[in-house]
Amino acid sequence: MLPTLPNIAGRINTMATFLLPVAIGTIILLFLYGKYVTSTLIPGPPTLPLIGNLHQLPSDDRRHVLAQWHKKHGPIISLKFGWSSVVILGNIAVTKELFGKRSLKYGSRPRMVMARDCMTKQMQTSTLPWGEKWKIHNRIQLSLVGGPKIRSYQSLLDIESCKVLYQLLSTESLVTCFNRFKFNIIYTLAYGKDPDQNESDFHEILELADHFTQTLTNATWVVDLFPILNCLPRRLAPWKAVGDDFHRRAMGWFRRNSEAAVKSNSWNWTKHVQFNEDTGNLSVSEMQYLIGVLFEAGVDSTATVLHFFVLACTLYPDAVTKARQELDKVVGSARLPTPKDLPQLPYVKAFIQEVLRWRPITAEGLPHFTLEDDKYQGYDIPKGSTVIFNYWSGHMDEDTYQHADQFCPERWIERPDLPLGVFGYGRRACAGRRLALMSLETLIPKLLWAFDFRSPAGTDHGKSRDPGTEHQGALIKPRSFPVSWHPVSNDRRLIIERLFQERDKDLDTVLDDIGKAFERY
C-alpha cells in the first residue's frame, strides 16, 4: 500500500562541513556537538535518485521486506517514494507515544491526490486533513458509532448475530454470512431499510468498497508521487476520469439511500443527523457521504476478522476447547451467550483479542501528517512529515508479544496490560472501533458456543495447515482454506432455530426502540 499513499516531502536536516581555522576548530566542534548531539536523521535503506525505495518494495506483499528493514534499522525507519519521504513505525509503544500522546502534532493527513481529490472530492472523512471540516465529520461519526449511545444497538446486534447462526446451519458460504452481518447492521441503522429486501444494495456497496481499495493499492499513481501533475489538463491526466467515475457511482448509492431514509417511518442515522446534529456548513451531499463511507470502513474489515477467527479455530482446537469449557461453565447449554456474560468469560474475551492481534487485517495504516516539528529518541521528525504505522510489524514484535507468530489467548490473561493497536491511536483512531468490537463480542462467543469449525475429514488427516495470507485491496485476508462446521449438539441447533423464528421481525419497531434509547444517552 505504501507506494500508492500520497505523501508530502519531508524536510531533512543536514550538517554542512566547513573549512575552519585551526585555532578555533576545537571550540566550534564542541559547539556543534552540544547543538546536534540529539539531532539524528532517521535510518533507512539506501535510495536511488528520483524513485527512492520504490524498486525495493514488491507490488503485492511488503510485510517481510519492511520487517527486515525494521530488524536492521530499528522501529523507526525512513523511506523515499518519488520526491516524498515517509517515516514508518514498526513498534506499538512508539506509535502509541507519537499518534496517541502527541496526537496534536501527528493528527493530520498528507495530501492524497487520488483518494481525496479525485475519487472522493474531499468528502471521505478518513482522508481529510486536520481542520474544521474534519472535526465536524469526526464528531458526527463518533456520535453514531463511537460513543456510549452504541449500547442502544445491542438488540439489533443480537438479531443479526442469531441470523448468522441460523444461516450457518444450512449454508456452505462463510463469505456471504460474514459480509452480511456487518452490512445488515450498518444498513439498517443508516437508512432504516430492511437489508434482506435490498440485495442489490449489498452487492453494489461491496463492489464500490473493493473498487476504492483496489484502485488505490493495485497501481502506483504517478500523481500521488508527483502531486503537481494534477494541474495537467484532463486529456493528459487519465486518473481524473477514474476518480470521477468512482465518485459518480458512490455518490449515487449514498444519495439514493439517504433520500429514502429521510422518508422512512422509522428512526435511522440519516434522519438523526439531518434533523438533530449540528452539521455546520456541510452540504447535503457531504452529510450523505459521511454516513455512506461507514460501510466502506466496516463491512469487509469485520468479515475478514471473522474469517481469521474461523482459521484460528481450525489451527488451534485446544484453544477452542478451553473457550467452550468456559462458556459451558458460565452460560450452560440452554441459552446463547450475551455481552453481559463477557466479564465472567476472560478466556473468550482473550480469544477475541488474540484473533485481532494474531492476524492484523491491514499491513500499514493510513498516513499521518505532522503539524509541528518533533523530536523522538534523538530523531528529528519535521513539520510536514508523512508517518505511517506498520500494523503487521507492530503486532508481530517479539519484544512485545512473546512467540508472536503463535495464537495464544493466554497472553492476554497473563499480561492484561498488553497493547492492542489494531484500531490506531489518537485523533485518527478508527471512529467505529467501539461498534466493531461490540459486534465481534456479540457474535464470536455465540459462534464458539454453537459450532465446531474443523478441517474436513480426509484433508491432511483432518489436520489444518496455515494457508498464509494475501492482499486483497487494502486488506490482508487468509488464503482459501478447507473448513467444515456443524452444531456442537442437536439441542443447540434447536435453540438457534427457535430464536431465529422468535426474533422481532418488525424492523420499524426495533429501530424506534433503538432511537428512543439512543436519544436518552
UniProtKB/Swiss-Prot annotation:
GO terms for molecular function: heme binding; iron ion binding; monooxygenase activity; oxidoreductase activity, acting on paired donors, with incorporation or reduction of molecular oxygen. Its main location: membrane. It is found in: Membrane. Its EC number is 1.-.-.-. Keywords: Glycoprotein, Heme, Iron, Membrane, Metal-binding, Monooxygenase, Oxidoreductase, Transmembrane, Transmembrane helix. GO terms for cellular component: membrane. Pathway: Secondary metabolite biosynthesis; terpenoid biosynthesis. Induction: Expression is regulated by the secondary metabolite regulator cclA. The gene is astF. Belongs to the cytochrome P450 family. Pfam families: p450. This is Cytochrome P450 monooxygenase astF. One of its GO terms (biological process) is terpenoid biosynthetic process. Disruption phenotype: Impairs the production of trihydroxy confertifolin and deacetyl astellolides A and B.
